[in-house]
């Protein structure tokens, strides 16, 4: 008896990581060794996150997660960590309308724990407590990105 679960002939969706890599890593501690002394209050930490995806073939994609963490004490930079962490993913069998969510939500979600650990290690190795970045809501990030692109398209479509 034939398997009727796949009657349209499409392959079962698969998502696999073929490779992971650190593309760029930078850590700056401009005030060392003074920045390593005890302080009255914790520095303000700002974290920026970005995700990009580029096709390598019909099924393989390079997904890059960029994390930028900057700690400031007033107007002085305490430390600045930047990481560009990538993964080569094989994405096959998904309907076309699911490709962008897979690339911009699921792939970075798989990369994040590794990137988070690298940032924690580099801040610890820089003389500070490890910076443990809170989990990131990639679904919300993707929704915001789509909304911004739609708003930009509306502005460009309006005649002057």
From Swiss-Prot:
A GO term, aspect molecular function: unfolded protein binding
One Pfam family per UniProt: SecB
Source species taxonomy: Bacteria, Pseudomonadati, Pseudomonadota, Alphaproteobacteria, Hyphomicrobiales
Protein family membership: Belongs to the SecB family.
NCBIfam families (alphabetical): PRK05751.1-3, secB
Domain of life of the native organism: Bacteria
UniProt record, GO biological process: protein folding; protein tetramerization; protein transport
Entry-linked InterPro entries: SecB, SecB-like_sf
Keyword terms, alphabetized: Chaperone, Cytoplasm, Protein transport, Translocation, Transport
Subcellular localization(s) per the UniProt record: Cytoplasm
Subunit structure: Homotetramer, a dimer of dimers. One homotetramer interacts with 1 SecA dimer.
Cited function: One of the proteins required for the normal export of preproteins out of the cell cytoplasm. It is a molecular chaperone that binds to a subset of precursor proteins, maintaining them in a translocation-competent state. It also specifically binds to its receptor SecA.
Protein name (record): Protein-export protein SecB
Disulfide bridge positions per record: none
Assigned GO CC terms: cytoplasm
């Amino acid at each position: 008896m034939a398997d009727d679960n796949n009657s349209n002939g499409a392959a079962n969706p698969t998502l696999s990581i073929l490779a992971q890599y650190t593309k760029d890593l930078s850590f700056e501690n401009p005030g060392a060794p003074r920045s390593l002394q005890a302080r009255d209050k914790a520095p303000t930490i700002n974290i920026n996150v970005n995700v990009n995806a580029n096709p390598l073939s019909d099924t393989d994609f390079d997904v890059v997660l960029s994390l930028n963490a900057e700690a400031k004490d007033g107007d002085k930079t305490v430390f600045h960590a930047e990481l560009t962490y990538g993964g080569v993913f094989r994405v096959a069998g998904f309907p076309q309308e699911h490709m962008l969510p897979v690339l911009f939500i699921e792939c970075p979600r798989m990369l994040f724990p590794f990137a988070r650990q690298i940032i924690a290690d580099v801040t610890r190795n820089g003389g500070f407590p490890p910076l443990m970045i809170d989990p990131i809501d990639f679904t919300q990030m993707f929704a915001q990105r789509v909304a911004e692109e739609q708003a930009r398209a509306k502005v460009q479509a309006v005649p002057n």
